[in-house]
Curated annotation (Swiss-Prot):
One MF term in the entry's GO annotations: DNA-binding transcription factor activity, RNA polymerase II-specific
Gene3D superfamilies: 6.10.140.140, Classic Zinc Finger
Domain KRAB: from-to ranges: 8-101
Modified residues (N6-acetyllysine): K466, K539
BP terms from Gene Ontology: regulation of transcription by RNA polymerase II
Upper classification of the organism: Eukaryota, Metazoa, Chordata, Craniata, Vertebrata
PANTHER family: LD28458P-RELATED, ZINC FINGER PROTEIN
Listed name of the protein: Zinc finger protein 749
Location of this chain's protein in the cell: Nucleus
Protein's job: May be involved in transcriptional regulation.
Amino acid sequence: MNLTEDCMVFEDVAIYFSQEEWGILNDAQRHLHSNVMLENFALLSSVGCWHGAKDEEVPSKQCVSVRVLQVTIPKPALSTLKAQPCKMCSSILKDILHLAEHDGTHPEQGLYTCAAEHDLHQKEQIREKLTRSDEWRPSFVNHSAHVGERNFTCTQGGKDFTASSDLLQQQVLNSGWKLYRDTQDGEAFQGEQNDFNSSQGGKDFCHQHGLFEHQKTHNGERPYEFSECGELFRYNSNLIKYQQNHAGERPYEGTEYGKTFIRKSNLVQHQKIHSEGFLSKRSDPIEHQEILSRPTPYECTQCGKAFLTQAHLVGHQKTHTGEQPYECNKCGKFFMYNSKLIRHQKVHTGERRYECSECGKLFMDSFTLGRHQRVHTGERPFECSICGKFFSHRSTLNMHQRVHAGKRLYKCSECGKAFSLKHNVVQHLKIHTGERPYECTECEKAFVRKSHLVQHQKIHTDAFSKRSDLIQHKRIDIRPRPYTCSECGKAFLTQAHLVGHQKIHTGERPYECTQCAKAFVRKSHLVQHEKIHTDAFSKRSDLIQHKRIDLRPRPYVCSECGKAFLTQAHLDGHQKIQTGERRYECNECGKFFLDSYKLVIHQRIHTGEKPYKCSKCGKFFRYRCTLSRHQKVHTGERPYECSECGKFFRDSYKLIIHQRVHTGEKPYECSNCGKFLRYRSTFIKHHKVCTGEKPHECSKCRELFRTKSSLIIHQQSHTGESPFKLRECGKDFNKCNTGQRQKTHTGERSYECGESSKVFKYNSSLIKHQIIHTGKRP
């Protein structure tokens, strides 16, 4: 008997459907039918079909069972197999899948698409590839029919499979071809191995599961719900990560500082910080050095930069020509590279598939996610070769290095001022154009920058404009103070604080310095004082300030005074002081300024602009610092305490000035009479007395005055104006001390003598009275 009578061809195992029957099947049934036919066809193609093989030598055989199919398989030693699958079988496969009428319509279309109307049509194309290319022919080396064995082996990877369909899927992965396509993306992907590229565009996937998962981005489906808070997720993996965040679970702990992480990969990345010479990417140093040592034969004729490949050079040259060939079909924006267009298009679709495992923030691409994760790991792989400072991103390093080089590539076309960064010159140009695009909805004030608007809007709320103001505000202690001083009425939290305070009234100073015999009320004051006699710092703030001394080399030296600077920009700013260069002139008074921002602040004097409003009382201020100082009046905040007398102050500089009373310091010396004065304001007034200077002249009578306030009071004599009037008696006063004069009507006597309990209206009267008890004249 002829052996070919026991052998099967594809017609023997093919399952046919009529047009009507095919229309009844749903998508899942059609996919199942296609997969079964594809598996059977692939198996027959691998062993050779027996159409027209009657005249050929029939080899000895062994049989393998696949589902219900008995296929005769020749021994591998024989060379009688056909080089290509049978064209007749290929035609039968097309007829079965009802695709013959579409032959040649789209010869390069992919196997599966997201759109249902293209599903069957694109299946035909992958099968044509199977019939034309040896690359798709599975190769079998173990042909045993024992159940459970892995009878199909991939020749490229050596991996074994139990079914030929699994082998076919693996060979698809090895080839890099993507059989599943989403036509809704509108993205065209190019590559040597991606032969199934739809003319309509579409994203490709190796697995059908990947296509289904991707399609959730189009329909907005989020099937995975967290039971605790009801948060929905598109992927199960994202739900698992979120659950770890919600529970605070951080199973991976670093050995250096005990920092914990949700994912092991984040821990590994973080540990690179503690190792010397870590790289920014996950590659070993030897491989990194090999990359750096590769020849770069393709050189740019414009800037001399060299590249590894011709493609990299072509891409780089677009930066010189300004060519932007890739256009977004949504907003019309152009891009230099296709990858940037693809990334930009995700802005329109809202697709953010990459989630940070630490904070749950979503990103459009893995590159941006990788950059973001450096915030959590603390990784700073880019080091400045000049000052040794580390940066998280290369772009930040490049900007920083311009400071050392003194490069100011971007110049203002109006005034010629140069800037290191492009966005700085864009912001600067708004000064010349007067453009203020950011307007406050509360007071309609406009700003050049959005950050200025955000800062300004805090004025209209109860929020603090600065973090330091919030910290100072939190120091206000609102706890009850039950311990009251019988001498001055001051209250304290504890009995110990009260006892320490009462030493001020008794004059007791039990703690004496062994070096200079100076005595103190409190032991802490003595300890603080003794640091003066050592090399230690008296205050922690002084130590912190000392640590800020920069020991880095300062290569930029001023030729006038010899002072050295870290950067060229700092030297340029310093030299303006030496040369007296003041390019910014006030149009009102002709005064010149070194910087434009100082001119802007100065011009508020002429315009009367007071942009900073107190949200409590509605008062306006010219400067932000003045507003911050004023707001402490409403909060009652006095965080700065004098260590000598316990008095509190709103500002640190007022405390410093006050402490001169205890130290006896008088830093201001009059050059005319040699007198020393404690305060600058007193010194200015005194200096005018010594020199006879009277700069303020009355326009009516030409009388001169030393101070502007004196001139204003004098001018009221010409106008007859008396701006200060008492409500009780209607009497007018030129000066604003109406509060003191009201005591005449109210009978208030707020100043009491501690010795005789006698009370007085004015503090000056009390001081005069106390001379009776002490015998001392102030």
